[in-house]
C-alpha cells in the first residue's frame, strides 16, 4: 500500500513537471522548464510563414530568426539553409542542426562540433513531385516537345516521329532516385541506376563504383542526376562523363547546380555530342539574365521547382525533432556526417 501511494505521488509530480506532445502516431513526455531556443537561419527567402507555423507548433519554444537574433548564446537548435559560415562559432550551446531541404550541402558541417547532430527533411510528397517532374521531362525529350515549341514560334507546322529511346539512367539511388525509378518503370521505361555503394533492386539494373558508371553511361538514353552534393560528386557531370554518353542522350539535372560543369555541357551540346538537357538547378541561383543557358535552344530551364517542400510537412518534421531533442531521444533522419548524406 505504501509503495502504491509513493508511486502515485511520483507520477503526479512527474506529470506536473511535464507536458504531452502528440505527433501523428507518437506521444512524447517532455519536461517543462526553460524553453528551447530555436534559430531559423535561412537566407534568400521570406521566412514569415515558416516562423509563424513553427510558433504555432512549438508555443513553448523561443523561435528566432537570423540575423535579427541577439541571443545566439542560448541557441540549441538551428534550421538552416545557406547560413553564413561565421554563424556556427557564435553558438556555444548548439545541439542539433536541421537542413531546410532533403540535402545538407548548404551546411558546412566541417565547422560544426562533432557532437552536434545534423538532420534533413524527408518528405514522401516531395519524392512523388520529383518523380512526376522527371517522368514529364523524359517524356518531353522522347516526344520532342521542345522542338515543337520552337517551331510554334516560327509558325512551322511540321510533324516528326517521336524517338524510340527508352532507357533512363539515374545517378543516385536514395529515396528520390527510387521514387523516380518506380514512376519511370510503371510508365514503360527501362531504368538503370548508379550509386557509390552497392545496392539491390528487383526492377532496376544497379551499378556502383567508377567501373559501374563507365559501364552504364554508354547504354542509356537519358541521364538523370539525383546525387547528394559532396566533395566527391561536385562536378561529376563533366566533359569526361558526357563523352561516354550516346550522342542522342539527354541530361536532366534536378540535384544541385554544382554537380554540372556548365561550360562542358554547352560544349557537348554545341558539338552535337549530346542532344538536349533539362536543368532545374544552377551554380548561381537565380540564374543570371546574361547566362548562355537562357539562349540555348537545346536547354530547357525551370527555376528549381522540380520538388518544392510543403510547409506543413516540413514544419511538422522540424517540430517533432525539436521535441525529440528535448526528450533526449534520437533525432529522425540523421545524416552521416562522414559521408555527407
Where is each model-derived feature located?
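Glycine-rich NAD(P)-binding loop of Rossmann-like domains
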Residues: 147-179, 206-207
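C-terminal helix-to-coil terminal segments
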Residues: 120-121, 125-130, 147, 285-341
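NAD(P)-binding Rossmann-fold cofactor-contacting core
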Residues: 187-203
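Phosphate/diphosphate ligand-binding glycine-rich loop within oxidoreductases
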Residues: 76-149
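Rossmann-like adenosine-cofactor binding region
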Residues: 198-292
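Short acidic low-complexity segments
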Residues: 63-74, 85-88, 204-220
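N-terminal glycine-/charge-rich "phosphate-binding" loop or analogous flexible N-terminal tail
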Residues: 1-2, 7-76
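A charged, well-structured terminal subsegment
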Residues: 137-160, 313, 318, 324
Amino acid at each position: 500500500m505504501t509503495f502504491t501511494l509513493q508511486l502515485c505521488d511520483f507520477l503526479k509530480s512527474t506529470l506536473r513537471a511535464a507536458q504531452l506532445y502528440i505527433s501523428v502516431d507518437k506521444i512524447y513526455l517532455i519536461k517543462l522548464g526553460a524553453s528551447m531556443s530555436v534559430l531559423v537561419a535561412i537566407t534568400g527567402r521570406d521566412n514569415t510563414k515558416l516562423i509563424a507555423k513553427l510558433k504555432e507548433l512549438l508555443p513553448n519554444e523561443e523561435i528566432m530568426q537570423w540575423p535579427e537574433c541577439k541571443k545566439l548564446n542560448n541557441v540549441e537548435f538551428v534550421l538552416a539553409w545557406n547560413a553564413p559560415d561565421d554563424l556556427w562559432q557564435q553558438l556555444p550551446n548548439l545541439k542539433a542542426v536541421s537542413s531546410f531541404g532533403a540535402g545538407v550541402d548548404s551546411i558546412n558541417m566541417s565547422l560544426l562540433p562533432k557532437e552536434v547532430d545534423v538532420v534533413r527533411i524527408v518528405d514522401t510528397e516531395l519524392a512523388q513531385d520529383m518523380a512526376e517532374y522527371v517522368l514529364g521531362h523524359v517524356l518531353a525529350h522522347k516526344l520532342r516537345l521542345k522542338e515543337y515549341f520552337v517551331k510554334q514560334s516560327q509558325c512551322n507546322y511540321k510533324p516528326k516521329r517521336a524517338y524510340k529511346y527508352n532507357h533512363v539512367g539515374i545517378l543516385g539511388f536514395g529515396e528520390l532516385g527510387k521514387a523516380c525509378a518506380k514512376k519511370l518503370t510503371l510508365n514503360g521505361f527501362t531504368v538503370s541506376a548508379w550509386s557509390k555503394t552497392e545496392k539491390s533492386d528487383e526492377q532496376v539494373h544497379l551499378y556502383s563504383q567508377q567501373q559501374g558508371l563507365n559501364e552504364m553511361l554508354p547504354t542509356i538514353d537519358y541521364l538523370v542526376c539525383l546525387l547528394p552534393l559532396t566533395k566527391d560528386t561536385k562536378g561529376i557531370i563533366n566533359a569526361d562523363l558526357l563523352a561516354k554518353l550516346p550522342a542522342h542522350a539527354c541530361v536532366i539535372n534536378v540535384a544541385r547546380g554544382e554537380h554540372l560543369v556548365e561550360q562542358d555541357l554547352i560544349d557537348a551540346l554545341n558539338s552535337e555530342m549530346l542532344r538536349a538537357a533539362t536543368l532545374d538547378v544552377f551554380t548561381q541561383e537565380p540564374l543570371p539574365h546574361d547566362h548562355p543557358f537562357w539562349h540555348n535552344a537545346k536547354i530547357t530551364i525551370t527555376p528549381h521547382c522540380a520538388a518544392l517542400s510543403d510547409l506543413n510537412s516540413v514544419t511538422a518534421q522540424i517540430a517533432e525533432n525539436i521535441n525529440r531533442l528535448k526528450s533526449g531521444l534520437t533525432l529522425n533522419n540523421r545524416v552521416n556526417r562522414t559521408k555527407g548524406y
